Amino acid sequence: MTLTFLDGNEGIARGAMAAGCSFFAGYPITPATSIYQQMLQLLPPTGGVCMQGEDEIASIGFCLGASMAGVKAMTATSGPGISLYSEQISFAIGGEIPLVIVDVQRLGPSTGSATKGADGDIQFLRWGNSGGLPVIVLAPVDAKDCYLLTMHAFNLAEQYRCPVFIASNKEIATTRESVDLDGCLPPEVVRRNPAPKDHSGHPFEPLEGELIPPFFPMGGHRLSRQTSSTHGPEGYITTDPAIIETGILRLKEKLHSGVDDFTFFDLDVQTEDKILLVVYGVTARAARTAVVDLREMGCKISLLILKSLYPVPEKLIRSAIKDKSQVVVIEMNHGQYVREIERLAVGVPVRFFGQMNGELISPESIVKEVTA
């Protein structure tokens, strides 16, 4: 076993390289800047490109262009930057452009505090696009998760032709720990699915029985079209209601139909439990300690750590909630993902504890909330 001492941001950079990333563009912003610095060291020696845009809008635009040309691309930012990314995120969704977007969250709103963490962007990542179509949001807990989930993020972006978010935060980004990268069983790398040379279809036309069209790279052997406007299979702008509805439903269904294939989680079940504790992100560290303390106090409790937030893994959550008398949700915000839990916990009381003051939620705070 060979241990590597790294933080979450380095885990993301290494995961990106292992997944085949060959293009990175970003604009410096705390606490995401070290991802850019890592990629600047890692990409050029392999023939990849790492560049700093003049601002966040340009940076994500560079990534979209690189991806449309056929290469795997990633960008990274924090709260103020993700707000500026919004229009281009919508373009990536509608244009079915594979892209990994890392949001190393910090305390908001607005500029907020660059050196304080939070999980305040969760709802923005889900709904911060015009049209409200579904997106994939993954939530690492530690540096190992950052490495593995980044690889999964690239695979999902390629497989489903969509932007994929990694919802990290300042504490995950800057916490250094020993990780056995060789022993953490990374997923098999998914390559881009280009349209075959004899493919007679259009740029946005899936093959028979499929929901995701093969990829027509810009500058490739086939004529390709791209637009941010509503379009039909040919890539031409359309105002035809039937064509628009068919396209929108396909964009929605391609993710919802595959959610069980990218549901990542840890579940610590106690026999005859009555309470389910639900957490995600760095708060999972405190929750693990709190669950140990609660069980020593005689509390029958299980712990669900969600590592894929959207599309909501409804089957998993409903199964975990089944036969519980109470659900407790803990978040580093004032209540964002708890709304999804409440929607699924029909007939089961849901309690919430949120904290957004720049400090980590402590195990003691969780114990106090559960036993109140």
Q: Which sequence ranges carry the predicted segments?
A:
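Thiamine diphosphate
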Residues: M1-W127, P134, M151, K170, ...
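Flexible, low-complexity linker and terminal segments
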Residues: T2-N9, E158-A372
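Amphipathic, non-transmembrane alpha-helical secondary structure
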Residues: R14, S86, K144-Y147, M151, ...
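Short, well-ordered loop/turn elements at secondary-structure boundaries
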Residues: A18, G70, G95-E96, G132, ...
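Flexible loop/turn segments at secondary-structure boundaries
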Residues: P31-S34, I60, I82-L84, G108-T111, ...
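N-terminal cationic-hydrophobic initiation segments that often serve targeting/anchoring roles
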Residues: L43, S67, I93, R126-N129, ...
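Structural motif
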Residues: M74-A76, V100-V102, V137-A139, F165-A167, ...
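Conserved thiamine diphosphate
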Residues: K116-N169, P194-P196
